[in-house]
A protein has these predicted regions:
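Boundary/linker segments flanking structured domains
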Residues: 1-192
């Protein structure tokens, strides 16, 4: 993924699994999410997260999500928790504020996992708030915890929220446990 192909404009983005990838589930979680997909160039992509950027798709999407830290990216925090990474206080001088991130090694591991397993589609527009609501309604991405009112994946989102609210990994990792595997796609562009 190259940041230079993303516009320095507001808009929306959809984060999908590469066709050969699945969500990483390395912790005990009882619900398997149902993934919705869309077709792009004769390939199906499972949607895991959608979002909006009010200023710059380049900065929000690439710099915060794909090269940032979990302290500033909800998708990074969700994926890291699913990978079983231990949450630590983000602000050393203010650990009681409840803001968390992962250690340096885990953040690097997460960045590599994301670059290897995810793709980002984007749609530059100025109606990003309404478009985001519609994308969440249409695709029901399991990692969108706010604004997702779909009953499908509700139990998964509750379990993921509980994982994210813990300040330490309370559940033992499960080795090699991975999940098995439409109106906006015409306007979306892939950043890969």
């Amino acid at each position: 993924m190259r940041a230079s192909v993303l516009p320095d404009k507001p808009g929306n983005y959809i984060i999908v699994l590469r066709s050969t990838s699945s969500l990483p589930i390395k912790v005990q979680i009882s619900t398997t999410p149902i993934l919705t997909s869309f077709d792009y160039k004769k390939e199906k992509y499972n949607v895991v997260y959608v979002g909006k950027s009010s200023k710059s798709l380049r900065i929000r999407d690439y710099k915060q999500h794909f090269t940032g830290t979990a302290g500033n990216s909800t998708i990074r925090k969700s994926l890291g928790c699913l990978l079983g990474f231990k949450l630590i206080p983000r602000d050393i001088n203010s650990p009681q504020n409840g803001k968390t991130t992962f250690g340096e090694f885990d953040e690097r591991t997460l960045t590599e996992w994301m670059k290897d397993n995810l793709l980002l589609f984007y749609y530059a527009n100025n109606d990003y708030a309404n478009v985001e609501k519609e994308l969440i309604r249409i695709y029901n991405p399991p990692l969108n915890l706010q604004g997702n009112f779909n009953k499908t994946n509700l139990d998964f989102r509750k379990e993921l929220s509980a994982l994210r609210s813990c300040t330490s990994a309370k559940q033992a990792p499960i080795p090699n446990n991975q999940l098995k595997l439409n109106t906006y796609p015409q306007q979306l562009q892939c950043s890969n």
